[in-house]
Amino acid sequence: MTLLALGINHKTAPVSLRERVVFSQDKLGVALDSLLQQPLVQGGVVLSTCNRTELYLSVDEQENQREQLIRWLCEYHQLRPEEVNSSLYWHQGNAAVSHLMRVASGLDSLVLGEPQILGQVKKAFAESQRGHSLSSELERLFQKSFTVAKRVRTETDIGASAVSVAFAACTLARQIFESLADVTVLLVGAGETIELVARYLRDHNVQKMVIANRTRERAQALATEVGAEVITLAELDEQLVHADIVISSTASTLPIIGKGMMERTLKARRNQPMLMVDIAVPRDIEPEVGKLPNVYLYSVDDLHAIIQHNLAQRKAAAVQAESIVQQESSDFMAWLRAQSAVETIRDYRAQADELRAEMTAKALAAIQQGNDVEAVIQELTHRLTNRLIHAPTKSLQQAARDGDQNRLQILRDSLGLD
């Protein structure tokens, strides 16, 4: 058995490719079932966010395991291997362990140290738990990674400055508009990222916010909290005309705002400029919208420059965090190596117990037949000793014949002779 991590993220692929390998939440169970039908896969977790899609797996080691897993990924998403091969990364053993710990701790995020990723990792883990898709090794690894993330959060200043994709979107809005108090903001979606954006905007005196969502019920609690109006996606077309800023993050698999819709909006607005920030993957806003006059469209990838500006405070803390990850990954690998001996130890103990039971039964039978107790005990200990030392003696003799001094020393250590 070996642990693997196979993935694609914001560092290796643009959003145009990442959105094609997203696993939608409502079909994640189906994907896990399909993944576990692969003969080499013992357990799996699928992590799919706007910035990464990753498979964490425990597998039976095979020569072509990489090719098998990439083939499954491509077939599932109807992609050709040559479309993704150069963007995929592959980690095995300790590298896979360290990678997950870094991801859970926010050390591999677009925004260094951002806390949202830990919740996303926990959600992916819970989905695999519900689907009984975890091996014992994989379950232990994820639990350990949650502990590591907590250590990083409490023992370093990695989360001291509040930066995230949501924060970056709001920073962009503040850079473009002198005052957010006088603008109308339309938020599309009601998920975690939009919640963060809405709270940030409220704290920066945005007076007019509208939340558009597929259902009013999901958005109403957030709207009440931040003082926003709620509309459905069906009302989006007529509401866009009033929006100076649009920030969108839904789980839709197709664009919600298209070029035609925006052409009508701009005409009604008499070409007043609009800032549009699309932080969804797959994208909510058709890329062609960005080519329209007076529309300033930014995607997740465009936020990268803004985010880089906020990294300086976290880099020193990241060095300390990496040290924690290195220590914890080494400890986990030591535990994992020890597990390979568990079955051998179990078999050895079972063999010894079987021998003890056999010898005891013979001794008791001899005593019941009237044989001298002391003589029976002497015979018992003699036979038990011979049986116990038989296999080690043969191994010692073979090591001596082979001239294998290392094996001889290992056997001496195992037998407690030194």
Curated annotation (Swiss-Prot):
Gene3D superfamilies: Glutamyl-tRNA reductase, N-terminal domain, NAD(P)-binding Rossmann-like Domain. SUPFAM superfamilies: Glutamyl tRNA-reductase catalytic, N-terminal domain (SSF69742), Glutamyl tRNA-reductase dimerization domain (SSF69075), NAD(P)-binding Rossmann-fold domains (SSF51735). One of its GO terms (biological process) is protoporphyrinogen IX biosynthetic process from glutamate. The active site is at 50 (nucleophile). One of its GO terms (molecular function) is glutamyl-tRNA reductase activity. The keyword Oxidoreductase applies. The record marks 99 as: Important for activity. It holds the Pfam family GlutR_dimer. It comes from the Bacteria. NADP(+) binds at residues 189-194. It catalyses: (S)-4-amino-5-oxopentanoate + tRNA(Glu) + NADP(+) = L-glutamyl-tRNA(Glu) + NADPH + H(+). Keywords: NADP, Oxidoreductase, Porphyrin biosynthesis. Coiled coil: none annotated. Pathway: Porphyrin-containing compound metabolism; protoporphyrin-IX biosynthesis; 5-aminolevulinate from L-glutamyl-tRNA(Glu): step 1/2. Substrate binds at residues 49-52, 109, 114-116, 120. Its EC number is 1.2.1.70. Possesses an unusual extended V-shaped dimeric structure with each monomer consisting of three distinct domains arranged along a curved 'spinal' alpha-helix. The N-terminal catalytic domain specifically recognizes the glutamate moiety of the substrate. The second domain is the NADPH-binding domain, and the third C-terminal domain is responsible for dimerization. Catalyzes the NADPH-dependent reduction of glutamyl-tRNA(Glu) to glutamate 1-semialdehyde (GSA). During catalysis, the active site Cys acts as a nucleophile attacking the alpha-carbonyl group of tRNA-bound glutamate with the formation of a thioester intermediate between enzyme and glutamate, and the concomitant release of tRNA(Glu). The thioester intermediate is finally reduced by direct hydride transfer from NADPH, to form the product GSA. Belongs to the glutamyl-tRNA reductase family. This is Glutamyl-tRNA reductase. The lineage of its organism: Bacteria, Pseudomonadati, Pseudomonadota, Gammaproteobacteria, Enterobacterales. The gene is hemA.
